[in-house]
Protein backbone atom coordinates (compact mmCIF):
# COMPACT_ATOMS: atom_id res chain seq x y z
CA UNK A 1 0.00 0.00 0.00
CA UNK A 2 0.88 3.63 0.11
CA UNK A 3 0.18 6.59 2.34
CA UNK A 4 -0.99 10.02 1.38
CA UNK A 5 -0.77 13.41 3.02
CA UNK A 6 -2.86 16.45 2.18
CA UNK A 7 -1.50 19.38 0.21
CA UNK A 8 -2.57 22.66 1.80
CA UNK A 9 -2.68 25.78 -0.38
CA UNK A 10 -3.20 29.10 1.40
CA UNK A 11 -5.39 31.99 0.31
CA UNK A 12 -4.61 34.17 -2.72
CA UNK A 13 -1.78 31.98 -4.07
CA UNK A 14 -0.65 31.98 -7.68
CA UNK A 15 0.68 28.63 -8.94
CA UNK A 16 2.03 28.50 -12.49
CA UNK A 17 1.23 25.85 -15.08
CA UNK A 18 2.98 22.45 -14.94
CA UNK A 19 3.98 22.91 -11.29
CA UNK A 20 4.39 19.67 -9.31
CA UNK A 21 3.54 19.80 -5.59
CA UNK A 22 4.50 16.72 -3.57
CA UNK A 23 2.37 15.21 -0.83
CA UNK A 24 2.29 16.87 2.57
CA UNK A 25 3.43 20.29 1.34
CA UNK A 26 1.86 23.46 2.73
CA UNK A 27 1.96 26.67 0.68
CA UNK A 28 1.52 29.85 2.71
CA UNK A 29 -0.95 32.64 1.96
CA UNK A 30 -0.19 35.08 -0.88
CA UNK A 31 2.70 33.00 -2.28
CA UNK A 32 3.69 32.92 -5.95
CA UNK A 33 5.19 29.82 -7.58
CA UNK A 34 6.60 30.04 -11.11
CA UNK A 35 5.46 27.68 -13.86
CA UNK A 36 7.23 24.33 -14.08
CA UNK A 37 8.49 24.35 -10.49
CA UNK A 38 8.76 21.20 -8.35
CA UNK A 39 7.76 21.93 -4.75
CA UNK A 40 9.12 19.42 -2.21
CA UNK A 41 9.07 21.48 1.02
CA UNK A 42 6.69 23.84 2.80
CA UNK A 43 6.59 27.40 1.45
CA UNK A 44 6.26 30.29 3.95
CA UNK A 45 3.57 32.93 3.45
CA UNK A 46 4.23 35.76 0.98
CA UNK A 47 7.05 33.87 -0.80
CA UNK A 48 8.07 34.02 -4.46
CA UNK A 49 9.47 30.70 -5.75
CA UNK A 50 11.29 30.49 -9.07
CA UNK A 51 13.08 27.25 -9.87
CA UNK A 52 16.31 27.65 -11.82
CA UNK A 53 16.34 25.66 -15.06
CA UNK A 54 19.05 25.12 -17.64
CA UNK A 55 18.14 25.45 -21.28
CA UNK A 56 19.99 23.30 -23.79
How would you describe each model-predicted region?
Residues 4-5, 10-11, 16-17, 22-23, ...:
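Left-handed beta-helix
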Amino acid sequence: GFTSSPIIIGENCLIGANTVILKGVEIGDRSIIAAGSVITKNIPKESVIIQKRELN
